[in-house]
Regions:
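Asp-based, Mg2+/Mn2+-dependent phosphohydrolase catalytic module
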Residues: 1-4, 96-99, 113, 117-219
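N-terminal helical cap/lid subdomain that shapes the substrate entry/recognition surface
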Residues: 2-93, 97-101, 114, 126
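Conserved phosphate-coupling serine/threonine residues in phosphotransfer and NTP-handling enzymes
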Residues: 13, 109-111, 185
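Conserved SAM-binding loop
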Residues: 14, 105, 163-164
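Short linear Ser/Thr-Pro motifs
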Residues: 17, 109-111, 167
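Residue-level detector of anion-binding/catalytic polar loops
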Residues: 35, 104, 180
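A structural signal for short, well-ordered beta-strand elements
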Residues: 45-46, 62, 84, 109, ...
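Short, flexible loop segments at the rims of nucleotide/cofactor-binding pockets, characterized by
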Residues: 82-86, 110, 181-183
């Protein structure tokens, strides 16, 4: 089957940036006087930004608003995207191959759209994308709306659009919405890898996995 569109997650898929989301929420809770558990990131990983901020304010009785938490986290992470987050191995090779095949690509991220652009511009990858959409505008990845909006902008039907995701809950949402899904290995979610492998149409230990590149060529 010929792929007519590709939608990429950002954190853990295009970039090795999950460390940001392991540390930034804990730093904000401490800033406002709370004592977060070491695994706070795991507790909030399936939540959207707003829901996670509300959870932190309520759970740790923080003397601030959810909006202040969101703004504080943004202040911590924006510089990381702009200046430091590294590219996942093979991202450039895969994107070049998709471009050579005429497959349009977009980003669908739980981060801010401008953060995705900042990272992609610095890494020299932004030229491969038509847009970056954020779940802050289109809804969390527990639902299909973000992926559907991205597919509409690509001009591709879900059944001919592949979604690249490292997060199991996001891959499930895309699969339920009728998309093809490529699960991307992420060491931060080691315990989810077998389920991701079973769920997805393809499982990629790295983005430039030879078997997947060959499948793209075959169409």
């Amino acid at each position: 089957m010929r792929i007519e569109g590709a939608i990429f997650d950002l954190d853990g898929t295009l970039t090795d940036s999950m460390y940001i989301w392991n540390e930034a929420p804990k730093a904000l809770v401490r800033k406002f006087g709370g004592e977060p558990p070491e695994d706070l990131a795991r507790d909030i990983r399936e939540m959207g930004r707003r829901e996670a901020s509300e959870y932190m304010v309520d759970t740790f009785c923080l003397p601030c608003t959810p909006q202040q938490v969101m703004e504080g986290v943004n202040a911590l992470v924006t510089g990381e995207y702009r200046d430091r987050v590294p590219m996942k191995t093979g991202a450039d090779t895969l994107l070049e191959r998709l471009g050579a095949l005429g497959v349009p690509c977009g980003i669908a991220t739980a981060s801010e759209a401008f953060q995705a652009r900042d990272a992609m511009v610095r890494l020299g990858l932004w030229k491969h994308f038509l847009f970056a959409f954020s779940s802050l505008q289109y809804g969390p990845k527990t639902g299909p709306d973000l992926y559907r909006a991205a597919a509409r902008s690509l001009g591709s039907a879900p059944e001919r659009t592949v979604v690249f995701e490292d997060a199991l809950h996001a891959a499930r949402s895309a699969k339920r919405a009728g998309f093809l899904v490529a699960g991307v290995y992420a060491p931060s979610a080691e315990e989810d890898q077998e389920a991701l492998r079973c769920l997805c149409d393809w499982y990629l230990p790295r983005l430039d996995s030879p078997d997947f590149l060959a499948a793209l060529e075959r169409g």
